Amino acid sequence: MLNFDLLTTDGLARRGRMTLNHGVVETPIFMPVGTYGAVKAMSPVELKDIGAQIILGNTFHLWLRPALEVIDAHKGLHGFVGWDKPMLTDSGGFQVFSLGDLRKITEEGVHFASPINGDRLFLSPEISMQIQRRLNSDIVMQFDECTPYQIDGRPATEAEAAASMRMSLRWAQRSRNEFERERNPNALFGIVQGGMFEPLRDESLAGLQAIDADAGGQGFGGYAIGGLSVGEPKEDMIRVLQHVAPRLPANKPHYLMGVGTPEDLVAGVAAGIDMFDCVMPTRNARNGWLFTRFGDIKIKNAVHRNDPRPLDETCGCYTCRNFSRAYLHHLQRVGEILGARLNTIHNLHYYLELMADMRTAIESHSFAVFRARFAADRARGAL
């Protein structure tokens, strides 16, 4: 089940509300990534404390480890990971296609060697839907081929991107058919592909909308933009985003997959995106790269050795309320696990507060003012 209410707009920016089987999600929203069933360095209680409404799990990795039988014993992924709010799972396609020489793509699906033990495995639209049904995620992603930006060290040609996109469209239909056959009570999202080529993006979206229409408008609960932030220049990412996002069906949520920086999130919301996910805030946190209202901080740098200030005096997260830059610098230098935890709490809090601020700005029809202030604050740099 997915009900989406578009509450108000400000330009192309949208303020919405998704009602899913495990709860309500206020949009626009950022989804922390829990690849193996855990958001790195964070407990479910901590995620709720910083305002996480929905988290993402990885179908491919959870299928391989711990295996579906283990998750079945917990009545699905929510019970296994101890999270009672909504969850989204990807289809596993991106991870399979990232295996390079270890995989072979056919019309039926993808044959590949397990990165864990080398076993020969096969993943198809049907199998992906069956796995995600057993995981019981609130939002299920269609099985697709993520068109790479580069093939053999050069940008993908339009013909290569077209072949990949059309394969994804055929797989979208098969995903939809299997989702229906499984009687999955959750929501299926289609994924717009087409590389850096606007006409191919248009063709992909039209094909997904045809599948949706054939199911009486119930074919897809939402629409995602895939194949961005895969190595392309930033200007190409923004160009494709600004072309596709306004064309997505207005009555369904819009999801920009795998993106990105704080600036990317603001640009995405300005273009009409409702949902984001990215490993950046958690990965950067573990590496000591911290996001603040006034720019980024590399906490390992010597300049922070004796600094008694919090990371961001305007931030209300647990880390900023209780610890100094000097202490976080020390933890990073000596490799203490607590450092990774405190950094992650801060970065995810920053991302989620950024989304909350954008929701408020859209509600008050002051998003343009917010966006200008955001850019000026970030450009100032952390002092």
Swiss-Prot record:
Highest rank taxon of the organism: Bacteria
Record flagged with keyword Metal-binding: yes
Pathway stated in the Swiss-Prot or TrEMBL entry: tRNA modification; tRNA-queuosine biosynthesis
SUPFAM superfamilies in the record: tRNA-guanine transglycosylase
Any one cellular-component term (Gene Ontology): cytosol
Cofactor(s) the protein needs: Zn(2+)
Entry annotation: catalytic residues: D90, D277
Enzyme nomenclature, EC number: 2.4.2.29
Keyword Transcription in record: no
Cofactor binding summary note: Binds 1 zinc ion per subunit.
Residues annotated to bind Zn(2+): C315, C317, C320, H346
GO biological process, one term: queuosine biosynthetic process
Chain positions covered by the region annotation RNA binding: 258-264, 282-286
Keywords per UniProt: Glycosyltransferase, Metal-binding, Queuosine biosynthesis, Transferase, tRNA processing, Zinc
Any one GO MF annotation of this record: tRNA-guanosine(34) queuine transglycosylase activity
HAMAP family: Q_tRNA_Tgt
Family: Belongs to the queuine tRNA-ribosyltransferase family.
Subunit structure of this chain's protein: Homodimer. Within each dimer, one monomer is responsible for RNA recognition and catalysis, while the other monomer binds to the replacement base PreQ1.
Protein name, as recorded: Queuine tRNA-ribosyltransferase
Species assigned in the record: Ralstonia nicotianae (strain ATCC BAA-1114 / GMI1000)
Gene (UniProt): tgt
